[in-house]
Amino acid sequence: MKRGVAIVGAVTMIVASLLIRAHLDEKSTTGSTGTADGHSSIVCITELADACRTAYGNDVTVEDATTTAKRLAKGGTDIDAWITFSGWPELLAADNVSPALDVKAVASTPLVIAAVKQRAAHLDCAANGWSCWLDAIGKPWSSVGGDATWGSVTVGIPPYPSGTGLLVQGSAATAYYGSTDVGTNDPQYTASQVALGKASQDPNVLFNFISQLPARYSAIGALQADVAAQQGAKADQIQLFPLTPPAFATAVVARVAGGDSVDAGKLAKPLTAAGWTSPVDSSGMPDGGVLLALSGI
C-alpha cells in the first residue's frame, strides 16, 4: 500500500514539474519574460528591428506597425513600450485610444524619392516630388523625354501596413495639397490616393530597387539613411530627391500608460551610427485624423 502511494506521489510530482516547465516555456516564447533591457514587453516596428535589438536585446517583439497599432486600439495592455515612427501614436490619439502613449522622439531621417539617376535626368519635373513621379507611372519613358528602351515609368513603395508605408501615404497627401493642412475631404487627398494606387507595394522595395537597378523601378519611396546604408557601389547610379513639402521619419519610444520605462538613449546610439540625426520638430505629416484614415485601422 505504501509503495503504491509513493508511486502515485512520484508521478504527481513529475506531472507537476512538466506543467511548470511548459508554463515557463510558453512565457518565454510569447515574450512575456523580461528582456535584455529588463522590461517585460518592448514591441518594435520592422524597420527599426536592428536598432531595437542592438539597444534592448534580442527578446524584443518585432512586427509591422499596423499589427501593433490594432492591438493598442483594442486596449492591449501587454505592451510596455512601442518603438515606432511618429505619426503612428498620433493616429491612435485621434482614435481616442486608451491608455494614452507617452511619446519621446529619438532620431530622424528624411523620407526621400530614390531614383535611377540616368532616367531621372530626363524627367523635367523629377525634383517636384510625389506629384511628378506618381502622375508619371505607366507612361512610356519616350513620352516624358526618356529612351523607348526603358519601357514605362515604374514606382515602388513600402506596403501600406508598414511603418514607412503610412509616411509615404501621408507625404503624398501633403504633396498634392501643398501643405500638412490637407484633410480627408479635400480633392487633393483623394487624388494622392488614386495616384499611389498605381505604385507597386513591395516589402523589399529598397533591396529590389538597388539589386535590380535600373530595371525594377524608376524610383521608390525610402528613408534616406537606409538608402545610404545599402546603396554600396551603386551610389553613383542613384539620385535622391527630398520631398516637397519636406517629410521625415522620426523614431520614437512610445510608452503605454502604466508600462515600464524604456531608456530612449539606448535607441539613439545605433540609429546615430546608422546615419540618423537629432529629431526634427515636425515630421511633415498630416494630422492624426488624416493618418488614421490612411491607416485603415
Description of each model-found segment:
Residues 171-243:
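Ligand-binding pocket segment of bilobal, Venus flytrap-like solute-binding proteins
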Residues 112-196:
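Helix-loop-helix "hinge/cap" segment bordering the ligand-binding cleft or interdomain interface
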Residues 26-151:
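N-terminal segment of the mature folded domain
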Residues 47-49, 66-69, 87-91, 119-121, ...:
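Solvent-exposed loop/turn segments at secondary-structure junctions
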Residues 128-142, 155-161, 251-284:
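Bilobed periplasmic-binding protein/Venus flytrap-like ligand-binding cleft at the lobe interface
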Residues 104-113, 233-265:
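Periplasmic-binding protein-like
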Residues 1-36, 256-297:
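Extracellular/periplasmic juxtamembrane helices and adjacent flexible linkers that interface
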Residues 47-51, 67, 132, 136, ...:
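Extracytoplasmic/secreted proteins, especially bacterial periplasmic and envelope-associated proteins
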